[in-house]
Amino acid sequence: MTNNLKPGERLDDLQIKGYEIIQSPGRFCFGMDAVLLSAFAKVKAGECVLDLGTGTGILPILLAAKTKGKHFTGLEIQEESADMACRSVRHNRLEEQIDIVTGDIKEASQIFGKGSMDVITTNPPYMIGGHGMANPESAKAIARHEVLCTLEDIIRESARILKAGGRFYMVHRPFRLAEILTAMCEAKLEPKRMRLVYPYVDKEPDRKSVV
């Protein structure tokens, strides 16, 4: 597989089922938030899962390894990241379980159809667009800042795509909790469970998961 890596890419061991993922340090590599979200999300046998803003496909791969879900789809707007995700899926021989789609989150309900998914996961950009960006068009800026989509876009499209009784899982930062709850209320998604994550016992929580 290393012969198929493009310049600047590396193959990282995911420490589960022998799966590996292609990443590029020059772009945006997954962090602990994606791992935490994969542990927080509950996927039942036979369910279909959509990951919005999948990046290099870390969440579909981890959820395929950890759960008995029927099928996993990752939506990613950046073509280079989507290409790495596709190659990681092939490398792990997960083509029958995982699809990677290149597309815009703002058009997700048009791409997949309303009421089509049992579960939606997302590890979205945390920062409001325009704050502290050296280059707003860089891959890292797009992953970290709301350049191409907003929190409201993600929640609105998720509400449209979920089946009745479906579940929405998101990891985000505590400082935007009020916005998250407001957007979920407007989209008629009712928060049921929240987990605060403390980096150290004597520190404030720096991220949270919401369903």
Task: Indicate residue ranges for each PLM-predicted region.
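Class I SAM-dependent transferase core
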Residues: T2-A45
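Glycine-rich, phosphate-binding/catalytic loops in enzymes
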Residues: S38, P136-A139, E186-A187
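Conserved SAM/SAH cofactor-binding pocket of Class I
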Residues: F40-T122, M127-M133
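Mobile active-site "lid"/loop adjacent to the S-adenosyl-L-methionine
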Residues: P124-D153
